């Protein structure tokens, strides 16, 4: 049998242990889900009883696909493979419930869509708008990490525009939203916001520069 070089158990109370096989790090997790109570920034973890129940708690259909390793058979109860082919970001089941479970998913939807060149399907997009203020429940460190992945990704301008359009940016960096109200005073661009998007698009993927 394959034996790991080392095992770490830092996430054991959340149902996760890790194993390292040479250069590869593998996380082994039991069936579980996470949700945020209205007055807390820390997630509550609940353990499930079946694979389908576990997949039903995932954020988007493209992330709710499993594989039976011995046979190679895909387990795809929510149409994730079809959405992958169609380049669609779609919440699993009820989008309102998915974003209540973990409001960071509001930003993850934007990041996946921008970085992968996908589109957010309408019901999911409308739910993001409804729950945008809930991003304030998430720790600043997690919000920072998501924003960093967008800014250093292949389409930071698309990500920024989507954050503004979906109502998230006003809770993250509200000064960016205010750029839409500033004119360049007869320059080439309609407003400073459009100019900023063009600049970000054409700079190297360095966080300090972008």
Show where each model-derived region lies.
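Catalytic cores of the polymerase beta-like nucleotidyltransferase superfamily
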Residues: 1-210
């Amino acid at each position: 049998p394959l034996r790991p070089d080392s095992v770490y158990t830092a996430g054991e109370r959340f149902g996760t242990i890790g194993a390292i096989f040479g250069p590869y790090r593998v996380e082994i997790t039991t069936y579980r889900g996470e949700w945020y109570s209205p007055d807390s920034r820390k997630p509550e973890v609940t353990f499930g009883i079946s694979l389908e129940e576990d997949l039903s708690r995932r954020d988007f259909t493209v992330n709710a696909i499993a594989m039976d390793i011995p046979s190679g058979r895909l387990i795809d109860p929510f149409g994730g493979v079809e959405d992958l082919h169609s380049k669609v970001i779609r919440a699993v089941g009820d989008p309102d419930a998915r974003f209540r479970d973990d409001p960071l998913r509001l930003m993850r939807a934007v990041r996946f869509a921008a970085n992968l060149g996908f589109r957010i399907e309408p019901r999911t997009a409308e739910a993001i708008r409804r729950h945008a203020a809930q991003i304030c429940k998430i720790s600043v460190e997690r919000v920072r990490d998501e924003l960093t992945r967008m800014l250093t990704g292949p389409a930071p301008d698309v990500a920024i525009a989507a954050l503004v359009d979906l109502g998230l940016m006003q809770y993250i960096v509200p000064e960016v939203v205010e750029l839409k109200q500033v004119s360049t005073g007869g320059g080439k661009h309609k407003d400073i916001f459009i100019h900023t998007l063009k600049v970000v698009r054409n700079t190297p993927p360095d966080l300090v520069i972008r």
